[in-house]
């Protein structure tokens, strides 16, 4: 059986094509037929769900007691400021958590460059807009930044009745990977024309490079599968394995399968959101603009998506898929 493994092709080259500072294409070829989708789907899921990173988990803004407090002299609502801070990309070189402060005298724009950092803290997107001061007054805030992995809603970290007034907790998306897609193209080796070429398109927030992200995901996959290499016994016999689809089956499920409250489900359907894939592409800001959909319904939606390893604000390529059919787009 071990000798038979030598008959399988191994990739001969890995090419990295930078598309921008934080985006690159990683090309792997040649692969046996079907291996492109098998490896591509596994790497994509790991890149989106299992990459360690940092996120703002708690914010204190001078003069703000809760997220619905209107800040005099500030153009943005508190909710908008918190959503802006969610996009902050920070690299912690030594510590697992840190509290940073930001202070700016108005009028003017407050950006990530105004955040006071320590020697072991790096802001990767200093141009990030945080707030706009419209009067001659200061803007003061403190940010707690922590290491983590995946997506962690506030409800999974602490009970609502234990929070201190003025401490604004944020749902944390720790992954430094913003977007991942893959395509499988045809490859040829000598007379064989039925081979695969895997093309990964990876975009990060700058905390890690696309190359580093792919290396980490591949190492994680290797470590998780290594236990099977030492299994005793023969290989199971059975039919041919089904090729994994490029699109996560969960995304193809109707909204009703999420078992949301009737109010939340009806609000989503009124906005032509009929499938999970439709929902995850919407942002918190967009959903909060939905008539009759409040913060409570939004939290319910985020918690439910988190249970399936999903979150709002995801970018899906080639959505909707052709297999969804025309009937899906008019479902209600």
Swiss-Prot record:
GO CC terms in record: cytoplasm; DNA-directed RNA polymerase complex
Subunit structure: Homodimer. The RNAP catalytic core consists of 2 alpha, 1 beta, 1 beta' and 1 omega subunit. When a sigma factor is associated with the core the holoenzyme is formed, which can initiate transcription.
Keywords of this entry: DNA-directed RNA polymerase, Nucleotidyltransferase, Transcription, Transferase
Region named Alpha N-terminal domain (alpha-NTD): 1-232
Keyword Iron recorded: no
UniProt gene name: rpoA
GO MF terms held by the record: DNA binding; DNA-directed RNA polymerase activity; protein dimerization activity
Family annotation (Gene3D superfamilies): 5' to 3' exonuclease, C-terminal subdomain, DNA-directed RNA polymerase, insert domain, RNA polymerase, RBP11-like subunit
InterPro entries: DNA-dir_RNA_pol_insert, DNA-dir_RNA_pol_RpoA/D/Rpb3, DNA-dir_RpoA, RBP11-like, RNAP_asu_C, RNApol_insert_sf
Function: DNA-dependent RNA polymerase catalyzes the transcription of DNA into RNA using the four ribonucleoside triphosphates as substrates.
Region entry Alpha C-terminal domain (alpha-CTD), spans: 247-332
An annotated GO BP: DNA-templated transcription
Catalytic reactions of this protein: RNA(n) + a ribonucleoside 5'-triphosphate = RNA(n+1) + diphosphate
Stated name of the protein: DNA-directed RNA polymerase subunit alpha
Protein species of origin: Halorhodospira halophila (strain DSM 244 / SL1) (Ectothiorhodospira halophila (strain DSM 244 / SL1))
Family of the protein in this entry: Belongs to the RNA polymerase alpha chain family.
Source organism phylogeny: Bacteria, Pseudomonadati, Pseudomonadota, Gammaproteobacteria, Chromatiales
């Amino acid at each position: 059986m071990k000798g038979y493994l030598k008959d399988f092709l191994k990739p001969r080259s890995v090419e990295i094509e930078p598309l921008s500072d934080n985006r690159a294409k990683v090309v792997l070829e040649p692969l046996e037929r079907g291996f492109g989708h098998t490896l591509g789907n596994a790497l994509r899921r790991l890149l989106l769900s299992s990459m360690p990173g940092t996120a703002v988990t708690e914010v204190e803004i001078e003069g703000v007691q809760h997220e619905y407090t209107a800040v005099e002299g500030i153009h943005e609502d508190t909710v908008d400021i918190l959503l802006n801070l969610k996009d902050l990309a920070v690299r912690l070189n030594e510590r697992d958590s840190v509290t940073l402060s930001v202070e700016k005298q108005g009028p003017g724009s407050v950006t990530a460059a105004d955040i006071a950092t320590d020697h072991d803290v790096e802001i990767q997107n200093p141009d990030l807009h945080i707030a706009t001061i419209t009067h001659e007054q200061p803007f003061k805030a403190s940010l707690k930044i922590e290491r983590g992995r995946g997506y962690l809603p506030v409800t999974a970290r602490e009970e609502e009745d234990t929070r201190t007034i003025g401490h604004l907790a944020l749902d944390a998306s720790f992954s430094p990977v913003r977007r991942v897609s893959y395509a499988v193209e045809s490859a040829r080796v000598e007379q064989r024309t039925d081979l695969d070429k895997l093309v990964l398109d990876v975009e990060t927030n700058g905390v890690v490079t696309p190359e580093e992200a792919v290396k980490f995901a591949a190492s994680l996959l290797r470590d998780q599968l290594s236990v099977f290499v030492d299994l005793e016994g023969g290989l199971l016999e059975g039919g041919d394995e089904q090729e994994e689809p490029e699109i996560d089956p969960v995304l193809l499920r109707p909204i009703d399968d999420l078992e949301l409250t009737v109010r939340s489900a009806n609000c989503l359907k009124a906005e032509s959101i009929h499938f999970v894939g439709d929902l995850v592409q919407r942002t918190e800001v967009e959903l909060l603009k939905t008539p009759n959909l409040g913060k409570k319904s939004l939290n319910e939606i985020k918690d439910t998506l988190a249970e399936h390893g999903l979150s709002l604000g995801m970018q899906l390529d080639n959505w909707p898929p052709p297999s969804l059919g025309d009937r899906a787009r008019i479902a209600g």
